Amino acid sequence: MPGRAPGSTLARVGSIPAGDDVLDPDEPTYDLPRVAELLGVPVSKVAQQLREGHLVAVRRAGGVVIPQVFFTNSGQVVKSLPGLLTILHDGGYRDTEIMRWLFTPDPSLTITRDGSRDAVSNARPVDALHAHQAREVVRRAQAMAY
């Protein structure tokens, strides 16, 4: 980027992989500087995680954003997400397809949230990553990918 110092933490949006915005318009997201702040790393490291497939993002309103649901309440990436993304990328899925699958309610997926006995049916796979069904989502991804 002209005028930027080598090693600058500001990455060009066009050079960062991101899928089409297939998310609900009300789905909360973080921009890359906020993700960097949460993770305690430079924005360039977040861009690297996106390029390496450890995170996925969408293009929204001229920028690149990452869904808030990919992070825990303490600001860390949900434990099973990077491995799940690797499985799906290795299976040939692109970021847009991955986002669509993660955020589409699945009538066969029922989750129970930590601290609750109430089952939520027709859950989204991304929500199951925060529940006891994370392994089930990974298993389903493996079956889809191979």
Curated annotation (Swiss-Prot):
Annotated segments matching region Disordered: 1-27
Function: Binds DNA at low salt concentrations.
Notes on the domains: Contains an unusual winged helix-turn-helix (wHTH) DNA-binding motif missing the typical third helix.
Phosphothreonine modifications at: 9
Organism: Mycobacterium tuberculosis (strain ATCC 25618 / H37Rv)
PTM section of the record: Phosphorylated by PknL. Phosphorylation negatively regulates DNA-binding activity.
Record keywords: DNA-binding, Phosphoprotein
GO molecular function: DNA binding
Signal sequence annotation: none
InterPro entries: Rv2175c_C (IPR041098), Rv2175c_wHTH (IPR048576)
The keyword Phosphoprotein is annotated on this UniProt entry: yes
Pfam family, one: Rv2175c_C
Subunit organization: Monomer in solution. May form homodimers. Interacts with phosphorylated PknL.
KW DNA-binding (keyword) present: yes
Protein name per UniProt: DNA-binding protein Rv2175c
